[in-house]
Swiss-Prot record:
Residues 482-494 have a biased composition (Polar residues). Belongs to the POTE family. InterPro entries: Ankyrin_repeat_domain (IPR050657), Ankyrin_rpt (IPR002110), Ankyrin_rpt-contain_sf (IPR036770), CC144C-like_CC_dom (IPR039497). Residues 489-538 form a coiled coil. Expressed in prostate and testis. It comes from the Eukaryota. Signal peptide: none annotated. Keywords: ANK repeat, Coiled coil, Repeat. This is POTE ankyrin domain family member C.
């Protein structure tokens, strides 16, 4: 809510809220703070108020009329309506038609937890009214006049700076630097900066010369002050910094320069608004985009606990709502009154915003469901692969067992053929071998001896040993080749990863170089501006 005491524009600049002034007459002038101090009379043609209208107003407002209008306090009659309270529908129309003046004028609206005038009337916007100074010639001395109008020759300015204090203040606590910066007199600003005047002096509203230069959009003076080390994070009496005023002016280049010199992107004013929240509140879409790119906090809260999304919904800006939803902001966050962005959209009848929020919520639900389903599928796949591996291993074991008797039979046949070649009882062979071979029972003679693996100085042919060694060599070669192949594949994977890392490093270096180039370009532009100023100054000397 706005504060109770605030600066208001002149009464002539305020539109009449649905002929309320003419009907209430002098009571309007006496009872409404926004009309006090105006030079014009608010009386109707009759010179007094309309009694019938006042009776209707009192009956519909009920106890709110009794609390808000001093003319009703202490009267013997009750101002409460027939229902015992005020008419809500009438109060809603009154608030909607009067706008923020309702919040200023009616004490029953001040300090309440609920918003009575929507997103635009909740904050004190008087900080951004009348950015330039109101100057009267008779209130300024020679130096301040020269700084404000800037039409004094350079030699005379130098003489003035010698004779008077350059940091002297006027009645509004303004220095010559304040006046020159606010009015864009860059030559005077440069002279004062060269003589090392005080940079961060505060005027009667606690504003520095840099704040006034930003507020009045004097770019050249802003750059001069920043280069000489002016502090851009000093808040004024409203809590606004230079970046707040740049956002209010929707000056993206100014905001970029301030951030480059170290402005705090998360500083809050007395309403709890960061520069991003202020841009959303005032529907400055281009600056909001810029601040989002500069990684401003999208979850920052104002003094009512409202996020940027809730403020955008309250202002009815569908484009900013869509821009914030693209950044995956939290839709379910609540303010201090316990309301979400969707509830504000429904109560304000913003149908387009309601559709945007519902579509975003559906997409988020689909993402969550897909993320939850993926691990289950992975587990199923791994379990199926393991079962297939077990089946393959089980099938391979019977095959090996079936191959072993076939190998034994082949060996027995070879032994029988050798026995036939060398005769019935060859030299060096024991009798059990010959008996087993002649009887034809390979299982009784040769096979049991092979199973027990006790050779008894047998002299078998060398061909079997050579074949056995050759098989072992082939197996070892296969294993070596497989290990080499796996090593090669691992090396390829490592090289690919190294290449990816190198590409990522190149991208990072290119981005850093681009940012350095941009900074250098800005500095070059500043130096060129300084050279141009120097040329102009030298031309004045000549």
């Amino acid at each position: 809510m706005v504060t109770e005491v605030c600066s208001m524009p002149a009464a002539s600049a305020v539109k009449k809220p649905f002929d309320l002034r003419s009907k209430m007459g002098k009571w309007f002038h006496h009872r409404f703070p926004c009309c006090k101090g105006s030079g014009k009379s608010n009386m109707g043609t009759s010179g007094d108020h309309d009694d019938s209208f006042m009776k209707m107003l009192r009956s519909k407002m009920g106890k709110c009329c009794h609390h808000c209008f001093p003319c009703c306090r202490g009267s013997g009659t009750s101002n409460v309506g027939t229902s015992g309270d005020h008419d809500n529908s009438f109060m809603k129309t009154l608030r909607s038609k009067m706008g923020k003046w309702c919040c200023h004028c009616f004490p029953c609206c001040r300090g309440s937890g609920k918003s009575n005038v929507g997103a635009w009337g909740d904050y004190d916007d008087s900080a951004f009214m009348e950015p330039r100074y109101h100057v009267r010639r008779e209130d300024l001395d020679k130096l301040h006049r020269a700084a404000w109008w800037g039409k004094v020759p350079r030699k005379d300015l130098i003489v003035m700076l010698r004779d008077t204090d350059m940091n002297k203040r006027d009645k509004q606590k303004r220095t010559a630097l304040h006046l020159a910066s606010a009015n864009g007199n860059s030559e005077v600003v440069q002279l004062l900066l060269d003589r090392r005047c005080q940079l961060n002096v505060l005027d009667n509203k606690k504003r520095t010369a840099l704040i006034k230069a930003v507020q009045c959009q004097e770019d050249e003076c802003v750059l001069m002050l920043l280069e000489h080390g002016a502090d851009q994070n000093i808040p004024d009496e409203y809590g606004n910094t230079t970046l707040h005023y740049a956002v209010h002016n929707e000056d993206k280049l100014m905001a970029k320069a301030l951030l480059l010199y170290g402005a705090d992107i998360e500083s809050k004013n007395k309403c709890g608004l960061t520069p991003l929240l202020l841009g959303v509140h005032e529907q400055k879409q281009q600056v909001v985009k810029f601040l989002i790119k500069k990684k401003a906090n999208l979850n920052a809260l104002d003094r009512y606990g409202r996020t940027a999304l809730i403020l955008a919904v309250c202002c009815g800006s569908a484009s900013i709502v869509n821009l914030l939803l693209e950044q995956n902001v939290d839709v379910s966050s609540q303010d201090l009154s316990g309301q979400t962005a969707r509830e504000y959209a429904v109560s304000s009848h913003h149908h387009v915003i309601c559709e945007l929020l519902s579509d975003y919520k559906e997409k988020q639900m689909l993402k969550i469901s897909s993320e939850n389903s993926n691990p289950e599928q992975d587990l199923k796949l791994t379990s199926e692969e393991e079962s297939q591996r077990l089946k393959v291993s089980e099938n391979s074991q019977p095959e090996k067992m079936s191959q072993e008797p076939e190998i034994n039979k082949d060996c027995d046949r070879e032994v029988e053929e050798e026995i036939k070649k060398h005769g019935s009882n060859p030299v060096g062979l024991p009798e059990n071998l010959t008996n087993g071979a002649s009887a034809g029972n390979g299982d009784d003679g040769l096979i049991p001896q092979r199973r027990s693996r006790k050779p008894e100085n047998q002299q078998f042919p060398d061909t079997e040993n050579e074949e056995y060694h050759s098989d072992e060599q082939n197996d070892t070669r296969k294993q070596l080749s497989e290990e080499q192949n796996t090593g090669i594949s691992q090396d390829e994977i490592l090289t690919n990863k190294q290449k990816q890392i190198e590409v990522a490093e190149k991208k990072m270096n290119s981005e850093l170089s681009l940012s350095h180039k941009k900074e250098e370009d800005l500095l070059r532009e500043n130096s060129m501006l300084q050279e141009e100023i120097a040329m102009l100054i030298s031309g004045d000397w000549n």
